[in-house]
Regions:
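Extended alpha-helical, oligomerization-prone segments that build pores/tubes and scaffolds
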Residues: 1-290
């Protein structure tokens, strides 16, 4: 939160500029950071989403004609999925690559959507992804959570598809991270009662042991090995709406499946990376003041 609070539309200098305006001074902000973020976005999007599609294949070992044809089929099909069946992929990637250099850390979630019946890719903001700052990396973290905001009508579709349990809407007066995001974007959240109901879900990817299953008989047994699950909670109703196994059914080792990709701009002092506001935010202020 400390790093994100600097990301208001004026580069973290809103209060200072209000004081300058009161004194009759110029409120023009030096575009140093905005220019750097725009240049990074333009170069990165060209590399990660070329005109032919973002997927490339590499054959490990000695290639044969049959393997090359198979690799081409895989590449063509995956590019078709991304460019034709996933309309959210490009705008989400574009937005992520602009925010990444600013905040220093972003995430992408890739999963099979039970409602849309297809693969989906979603840009997840840093303030909507909760993980211990002491974690070494995403893949060795014992628990992390994704804050999901979903229109009530969409939630009902997932209930009908058997993905979530029914949960009565109880309002969203509080939000675990919405206040931070609204402050960053400079907007005031609002909603029309009855027509704009938004469910706030906490999707926790964690290790747990349930009574009577997982090979454990006693929760106090220190030798019991917890297994990976995805537990989803209705934040406002304080109700569990989904518990799902998070390993392949045929996997004897029962290893956790990871649905998120972590992107760092620069290495930080902990789990989260550093961005331009962390590194040259003070320089931007100095350039504006001069």
């Amino acid at each position: 939160k400390q790093g994100l609070e600097t990301l208001d539309p004026n580069g973290g200098m809103a209060e200072e500029e209000n004081q300058r305006a009161t004194r009759g001074l110029s409120t023009v902000v030096h575009p140093m950071i905005a220019e750097a973020a725009t240049q990074f976005n333009a170069k990165a999007i060209a590399e990660l989403y070329p005109s032919g599609g973002p997927v490339k294949t590499v054959i490990v070992g000695d290639p044969s004609e049959e393997m090359e044809e198979q690799a081409k089929r895989v590449k063509d099909y995956m590019n078709y999925q991304i460019t034709q069946e996933m309309p959210e992929y490009f705008p989400d990637l574009d937005q992520m690559l602009f925010q990444l250099p600013l905040v220093g850390h972003t995430f992408k979630k890739v999963w099979w959507d039970a409602n849309l019946d297809r693969q989906c890719s979603q840009f997840v903001k840093a303030e909507d992804f909760i993980v211990s700052p002491d974690s070494k990396d995403l893949y060795t973290s014992s628990r992390y959570s994704h804050v999901i905001r979903m229109p009530r009508n969409d939630y009902n579709k997932y209930v009908k598809a058997g993905y979530y349990l029914q949960s009565e809407y109880s309002g969203n007066d509080t939000d675990p991270s919405g206040d931070i995001g609204s402050e960053i974007e400079g907007v005031d959240p609002y909603g029309d009662e009855g027509t704009d109901e938004v469910m706030t879900l906490i999707e926790m990817h964690t290790y747990y042991t349930f009574d009577g299953i997982d090979g454990g008989e006693d929760d106090d047994d220190d030798n019991v090995i917890a297994l990976p699950y995805v537990v989803t909670i209705d934040y406002d109703a304080e109700k569990v709406v989904s518990i799902r196994r998070n390993w392949d059914e045929d996997d004897e080792k029962q290893q956790r499946r990871d649905w998120f990709v972590s992107y760092k701009f620069l290495p930080g002092t902990g789990f989260y990376g550093f961005g331009l506001f962390h590194m040259i935010g003070g320089l931007g202020k100095a350039a504006t003041g001069s």
